[in-house]
Amino acid sequence: MKKLLTVMTMAVLTAGTLLLPAQSVTPAAHAVQISNSERELPFKAKHAYSTISQLSEAIGPRIAGTAAEKKSALLIASSMRKLKLDVKVQRFNIPDRLEGTLSSAGRDILLQAASGSAPTEEQGLTAPLYNAGLGYQKDFTADAKGKIALISRGDLTYYEKAKNAEAAGAKAVIIYNNKESLVPMTPNLSGNKVGIPVVGIKKEDGEALTQQKEATLKLKAFTNQTSQNIIGIKKPKNIKHPDIVYVTAHYDSVPFSPGANDNGSGTSVMLEMARVLKSVPSDKEIRFIAFGAEELGLLGSSHYVDHLSEKELKRSEVNFNLDMVGTSWEKASELYVNTLDGQSNYVWESSRTAAEKIGFDSLSLTQGGSSDHVPFHEAGIDSANFIWGDPETEEVEPWYHTPEDSIEHISKERLQQAGDLVTAAVYEAVKKEKKPKTIKKQMKAKASDIFEDIK
């Protein structure tokens, strides 16, 4: 769960008035002003919204290692090439895993498979349900044989519950949560293996199953799969070894979810930022990266950072990561700059400066991980994740990791605000400073400043 711990809240000084962070979102009044000449960075939310539609509606759930994830990667790479970026594809292996479906009485139920459990036969398993309470040995009778054991979380470890069910002759195990949650629980077998399928589901779904007679479970093993990172590079002119600024977002989703906000929104805002920033003069290299397999444990970003050379690491300056920046949930009224340690860094400072320039007053510094900024931080690179959240409950949205994470719950106003702010923040980090090229010019410039002061 992407939760937020508020550490610092920003106050903006405008015309001598102290403005506290707003608890509601208002549309941006103008495009971002990025220089004294008031040249504009025209971030367009409608472009990002269109890309979200392609990812979440035309393609749909983008589970790591699947054809849908690869189709998304092709779309992203094509978009980057149209922007004349130098595009590279970095492939990597992902761990073997189980995925599947569960249904009962004509209703599909979201599940998470336990690592270390067995798959079902290809056709799946349809069997009567056996209510095994908390899964103690005494909870199983001879009647459990050949059935699917339905067990509540609590008291015993998941492995103990599963082994007791297997010993009693159960064909599979469904463990349901004992507390409310937005997503199904994942039973942790602590590195052990069992010979029957084991899955976890939400509390409400488990309680509903106690009233049903049978269920159908299909669990398939996925092995030898790969995912890919898509990297689009904008290089500065006439600079051999520039510092590197990273703008990143993951494009995969969890099973069943169209992933409109998580994270079609971050990917789409990143691509629109690339369009806006491609022609901006800069003395730094910008790498726009769409990471694969984030939902499996930050696999894409970890692989990328692990394979940076020593020279690249020394040149790496900062990482701006975008994850869930388009929600329409009214309560998610604060845009958080989420650092792993909760401390101010280059991302926060450039974001705060950008917010002051564009008049954005709903920005807070927070502590937290669970996204692709983490590997950069661990490598010593200043990094942060941008995400909308509710300052009261720390929740991001009620549709997180569910089939309801669809384009109907995307706000163009939130996309515009996040896009304006992060684009301006990245510009603060990469803009080309005008500096005298020679000592003579530098002395002349200083003399001119003095003359201006005494006129």
Curated annotation (Swiss-Prot):
Residues spanning the membrane: none
Segment forming the signal sequence: 1-31
Catalytic activity: Release of N-terminal Arg and Lys from oligopeptides when P1' is not Pro. Also acts on arylamides of Arg and Lys; Release of an N-terminal amino acid, preferentially leucine, but not glutamic or aspartic acids
Binding site for Zn(2+) 1: H250, D262, D323
EC number: 3.4.11.6, 3.4.11.10
Any one annotated GO CC term: extracellular region
Compartmental location: Secreted
pH dependence: Optimum pH is 8-9.
SUPFAM superfamilies linked to this entry: PA domain (SSF52025), Zn-dependent exopeptidases (SSF53187)
Cofactor note: Binds 2 Zn(2+) ions per subunit.
Sites where the protein binds Zn(2+) 2: D262, E295, H401
Keywords linked to the UniProt accession: Aminopeptidase, Hydrolase, Metal-binding, Metalloprotease, Protease, Secreted, Signal, Zinc
Cofactor(s) recorded in Swiss-Prot or TrEMBL: Zn(2+)
Keyword Hydrolase: yes
CDD domains reported for this sequence: M28_like_PA, PA_C5a_like
Pfam families reported in the protein's UniProt record: PA, Peptidase_M28
Molecular-function GO term, any one: aminopeptidase activity
PANTHER family in the cross-refs: METALLOPEPTIDASE M28 FAMILY MEMBER (PTHR12147), PEPTIDASE M28 DOMAIN-CONTAINING PROTEIN (PTHR12147:SF26)
Subunit structure: Monomer.
Known function: Catalyzes the hydrolysis of a range of N-terminal amino acids.
Protein name per Swiss-Prot or TrEMBL: Aminopeptidase YwaD
Gene name for this UniProt entry: ywaD
